[in-house]
């Protein structure tokens, strides 16, 4: 993932629903394997993780234009994260947004939210199977 304890990223297009927020930091969480993606002004934060932590065969088919938008030409620059949804009434009912992953260029410190073209992924993929 991203090795540093806390690192800042520019999101020129913002995040869907939060287009006006352009700067985020990603920092370690005490709840591994999750990290916290927090806006610099601390108004908004998301719980994120690598989708490969719970779905090793994840193939989102991210468009090359999306990677180009954040200047991530090489594989070693690219990181894929997903936003996690925790449901208050049932902590085992944790879902991940696999339909709109966060993509990061970890060298240029740029990010965006992409739309996955693989139809088998949803906005609410169950992280823990029963």
From Swiss-Prot:
Which cysteine pairs make disulfide bonds?
none
Q: Does the keyword Plastid apply?
A: no
Q: Which InterPro entries match?
A: Flagellar_assembly_factor_FliW (IPR003775), Flagellar_assmbl_FliW_dom_sf (IPR024046)
Q: A GO biological process this protein is involved in?
A: regulation of translation
Protein origin, superkingdom: Bacteria
SUPFAM superfamilies assigned to the protein according to its UniProt record, in alphabetical order: BH3618-like
Q: Where does this polypeptide localize?
A: Cytoplasm
Sorted UniProt keywords: Bacterial flagellum biogenesis, Chaperone, Cytoplasm, Translation regulation
Q: Name one GO cellular component term.
A: cytoplasm
In UniProt terms, what function does this protein have? Acts as an anti-CsrA protein, binds CsrA and prevents it from repressing translation of its target genes, one of which is flagellin. Binds to flagellin and participates in the assembly of the flagellum.
**PANTHER family xref list:** FLAGELLAR ASSEMBLY FACTOR FLIW (PTHR39190:SF1)
Family recorded in the similarity comment: Belongs to the FliW family.
Quaternary state and interactors: Interacts with translational regulator CsrA and flagellin(s).
Indicate what this protein is called per its UniProt record.
Flagellar assembly factor FliW
């Amino acid at each position: 993932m991203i090795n540093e304890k806390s690192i800042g990223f520019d999101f020129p297009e913002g995040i869907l629903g939060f287009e006006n927020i352009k700067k985020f930091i990603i920092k370690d969480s005490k709840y591994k394997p999750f990290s916290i993606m927090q806006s610099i002004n601390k108004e908004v934060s998301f719980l994120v993780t690598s989708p490969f932590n719970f779905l090793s065969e994840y193939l989102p088919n991210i468009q090359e234009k999306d990677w180009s938008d954040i200047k991530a030409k090489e594989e070693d620059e690219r990181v894929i994260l997903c936003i996690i949804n925790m449901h208050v009434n049932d902590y085992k009912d944790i879902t991940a947004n696999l339909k709109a992953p966060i993509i990061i260029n970890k060298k240029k410190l740029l990010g965006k939210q992409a739309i996955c073209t693989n139809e088998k992924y949803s906005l609410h993929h169950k992280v823990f199977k029963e």
